[in-house]
C-alpha cells in the first residue's frame, strides 16, 4: 500500500508469500510463495470396480483403479472439505482425492501415473515439475481464505526452514526443535 510508506509493517500472511486480499495493490511487491507442503505415499492398492473408498464409502470405484494413501488429514489441518474435490501432485501429475479426507489420511487415484511407488513424494502445496497447487487454489476448493488455510496447519506437521536452497532448521512437535 503506497500510502503506508513502509513506516510500520504488519507482515502477517505476507511472511508466507501470500497476498492478504484482492484489495492490496500488488504491483509494489513481488511476492513468492514461501510455503510448501509435502508428504509421501505410504500405501498402494489396486481395487476392483465397485470397491468403496474411505469412510462411508462415498466414493465407489467405477473401474479397476490404483489407489495411494497419503498420511495427512484434517487432524493436520488439511481440510475435510477437500473430500472428493481436491488433488495432490505426484511425479508431476494431478492425483484426485477419492472419498473423504479422514483425520490422519486420505486416498488418491494414481492409476494414470506410471511407475508410482510407496515412498514417492506427494505435493499438497507447491510445485512438482510443471504443475502447481497454490494455497489460494486450495482455499477456493475448500471454501476457506488463505489466512484460514495456513493458520489451520497443525503442529503435527514437521516444519523445515530453508534459506538459499539450504536447510537451516527444523521443527518437529514430536522430536523438538533444531536450528543450525
Which residues does each PLM region occupy?
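Active-site anion/phosphate-binding pocket segments in diverse small-molecule metabolic enzymes
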Residues: 1-180
